[in-house]
Amino acid sequence: MLSIMATLAASLLTAAPAQAVDDPGLALGNFELRPIGNKAELQGRVDKLNADLPNIGVNSILKADARQGTWSSGVCNAAAVESGTKPENFTRSFCFDDADNGNANSEWWPQGVTTVADADEDQTWGDPEAGWNPADHKPMMVTWYNKDDWNGDKKPDDADADGLNTERKGVRVSFIDSSTGKYAHVLLVYPFINSSGNASYMSVRTSQHYSSSQYNYGSLHAGGIVWYGYYLYVADTNRGFRVFDLRNIIDLGALPAEKWGTSKTAIGRQDGVYHAHGYRYILPQSDGWTNTACDTVEPPPGTPCDMQDNDKTCQANDVTPKTSFAGLDRSSSVRHITTGEWCEKAQVTDAYTTGRVIRRPMNASGGTPKLDANGYWAADEAYRIPYNTSYTDNGGIQGAAVINGTYYLSQSRGMSNGRLIVARPDTGTGRLVETSPRRLSAIGVEDLSVWPGSPNQLWTVTEHPGKRMLFSVTP
């Protein structure tokens, strides 16, 4: 098998980029993203919040007396791997504190990973200050979604340990100091104008309105994140991306004590007091990119994007993709964000149930997408995720990273160690084809992010309560 893989790998490395034409599920027109229809309105709401509330920067958050995690040159959480194992080419790990490592009742589950190496080519953020050198405090970020449907009835109404009215807390992002291990959570929020005409905000959900629908619009899954320039691109499974500008981070803790509500059961402005489910920092959405079926995140009930994440299928005739994960590629001549679809374990008889990966170009500066003549963010490559009959489990991909045309895919496998899959595009079939045996990873691996260097590093995070670990491997 290895000799066959080597021969195939050599042929793929010399193949000229092209797009397969015989697979309708890979037609690039399926994957264009449009700017959300209410961008100007959203920005106006954010401006009102910024006028009312104090802002704070990334480094100021890292300087604060926050939570304390642990860096290790070994596996910092033995429960994150099967007994006696370690991810292949392992380099370093980070463990959250005991509360965030979680237990059987954990409400927050980690998903997406990005770092300052995505954000800026020099891999630092901000300018030196007295007693603070940004080169010694390089930030990393991890998204977490609020698990609000424990019984699987597609109704995000299951109260957590904080009591009533705590469902649908949405998404938080951990800002992590890659040197000290200090970290803090920032709650992502969606701004709106309340009935009194004041700027307020709610949690980030699959749709940003209340409804009696069976779906009830649960917390956004946020399975991927890319930090590029000042912007965070957070995966919206059924649309594309929610976009957050880091210049808009708000520090509720800097308000007078009577204005900051620390209750974990409330969010938004209520009677002149600002709540955020107990969190100090919030970051409001200011922009977004959406597929052609959904032009806003405030749609009337019943539109194509009024569904929970797992309602989109993974079939041969799929058109509109899921955006389950995301990663930045700085190695290509034009920078790209690579997204892809999580699909459950593929059936052994169906090579089309593994999902797809899609690449969209980014501008070299400004942190913005590279748009076509119509103002759309169009894809220029798309491929089927590997289907390899040498293995009984295909699909289950939770993250993708690309370095010099080689794709690295993180595959979760329940409570067994996951795998890192290495593949190259076969442009004749439109499918990624594996070029080496699958590599041992950890339990519950998620999104991937590249930290360029000598050597390069691939970062991922494991999601299961009690088994959580942020770690890197060399590709």
Where are these regions (language model features)?
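Secretory targeting and sorting signals
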Residues: 1-20
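Surface-exposed loop and turn segments in beta-propeller and other repeat-based domains
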Residues: 50-106, 181-216, 256-319, 367-393, ...
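Structural signature of eukaryotic scaffold interfaces centered on beta-propeller domains
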Residues: 105-137, 217-228, 312-336, 393-404, ...
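Short loop/turn segments immediately following the C-termini of beta-strands
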Residues: 143-147, 237-238, 246, 340-344, ...
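Beta-propeller blade signature
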Residues: 161-179, 244-269, 349-370, 418-430, ...
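Blade-level signature of beta-propeller repeat domains, shared across WD40, Kelch, NHL, RCC1
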Residues: 445-475
